[in-house]
């Protein structure tokens, strides 16, 4: 790297010197040499890639180094999957959680972001999709599978609650802009899961009060025929609508009939 810097300084200072041709030839060889890039890649840090870009401007692998820097700063999980830089597996784990595993497919650490509103789309038409209720960020430091624990709620209210046999793919939600505004207000309000779930269903499903009644809890000892206890009652529904209203979301479909 010192040679390349010295050559640049020489060419800047003596653009018509006797050794310009040799200097340019040497510089071209340095900018085509993979060794400095591979050294930065092996370190796998923002500092290493930044130093490489500073020492070797115009290097043939400059674009790869800049891409790696962006990956280390943090990228949307959907973009990383689409660019085949990470692999993700996910399956159902009830109404409040989704089991997610991820691994990197590139030879350096990757910081993945799962933004609010990201959808986990069920492979089964009978199971609900899941939606992120808070942004999560994870660093994949090795090429082994790592378990992630994102905060989610269910969408597509009429469908079944996902179980371990239901797998998901990841994509951006068509409601993502509204959810990005809504969920920080939900978090700030410090409300429980029933209110959070109600708020999400209002956004993703235009749910009214009767619709929200489908969320029930059933004691473990209860018989199969037992209908369960409604979780989203008037207080939870009203609180969810208040938060949606604060977020500027149309709640005219939420009726108390």
What does each model-found stretch correspond to?
Residues 147-148, 155-253:
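Mature extracellular/secreted ectodomains of secretory-pathway proteins
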Residues 11-25, 53-64:
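Short solvent-exposed coil/turn linkers within tandem alpha-helical repeat scaffolds
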Residues 70-93:
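Low-complexity, acidic Ser/Thr/Pro/Gly-rich terminal tails and inter-domain linkers that flank the onset
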Residues 10, 52, 100-102, 200:
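Buried hydrophobic-core signal for structured, non-transmembrane domains
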Residues 27-30, 34, 69-72:
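TPR/TPR-like alpha-solenoid repeats
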Residues 17, 90-92, 96, 100-114:
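Asparagine-centered strand-capping/turn motif at beta-strand->loop junctions
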Residues 1, 32-44:
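Disulfide-bonded cysteine-rich modules in secreted/extracellular proteins
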Residues 119-166:
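Intrinsically disordered, low-complexity Pro/Gly/Ser/Thr-rich segments with frequent PxxP/GP/PP motifs
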